């Protein structure tokens, strides 16, 4: 969820056919009238997805399934993230992963248009919020 800036519903709605393991690409079907986009899958992430799919002996279309073979639910994701937060003594919620992706991209100096496309925002005003707090954007400003 973090690496692709996914909303919980976008993550639990993903299907196997949205992942192209040979090309290391994921089709991200955005919600809320956002723009869908194909994104690269990085090495570590690609290995984790392959490993996860190799443990499954089903032909279910969903990428993420419960132990009962049903699609993962929003509630299950909320629970898992809440429990992980408790173990780390942090108060977290799933949408923080999406926001963290935006802040990370901004701090890495990603241009606003690329961030907008990556996050699936139709309106740049939703993307600007991430760059506004990116302190690194001022580094080297006067070194020319």
What is each stretch, according to the model?
Residues 4, 8-9, 13-51:
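Conserved tyrosine-mediated DNA breakage-rejoining catalytic core shared by Y-recombinases
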Residues 15, 106, 119, 130-131, ...:
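DNA major-groove recognition helix of helix-turn-helix
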Residues 42-91:
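Active-site/catalytic core of tyrosine-dependent DNA strand-transfer enzymes
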Residues 28, 81, 127-130:
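Mobile genetic element proteins and their domesticated derivatives, centered on retroelements
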Residues 37-40, 132-144:
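DNA/chromatin major-groove-contacting recognition/catalytic segments
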Residues 39, 78-117:
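Short, basic (Lys/Arg/His-rich) helix/loop patches that form interaction surfaces
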Residues 1-13, 108-110, 121:
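A short, glycine-centered helix-capping/turn motif at helix boundaries
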Residues 19-21, 73, 90-91, 111-131, ...:
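Short, polar N-cap/turn motifs at the start of nucleic acid-interacting alpha helices
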């Amino acid at each position: 969820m973090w690496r692709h800036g996914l909303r919980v519903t976008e993550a639990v709605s993903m299907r196997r056919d949205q992942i192209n393991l040979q090309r290391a690409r994921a089709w991200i079907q955005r919600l809320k009238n956002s723009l869908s986009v194909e994104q690269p899958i990085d090495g570590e992430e690609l290995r984790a997805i392959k490993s996860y799919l190799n443990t499954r002996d089903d032909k279910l279309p969903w990428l993420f399934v419960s132990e009962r073979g049903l699609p993962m639910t929003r509630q299950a994701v909320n629970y898992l993230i809440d429990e992980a937060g408790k173990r780390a003594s942090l108060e977290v919620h799933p949408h923080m992963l999406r926001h963290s992706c935006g802040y990370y991209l901004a701090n890495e100096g990603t241009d606003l248009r690329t961030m907008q496309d990556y996050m699936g925002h139709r309106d740049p005003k939703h993307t600007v919020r991430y760059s506004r707090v990116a302190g690194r954007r001022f580094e080297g400003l006067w070194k020319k």
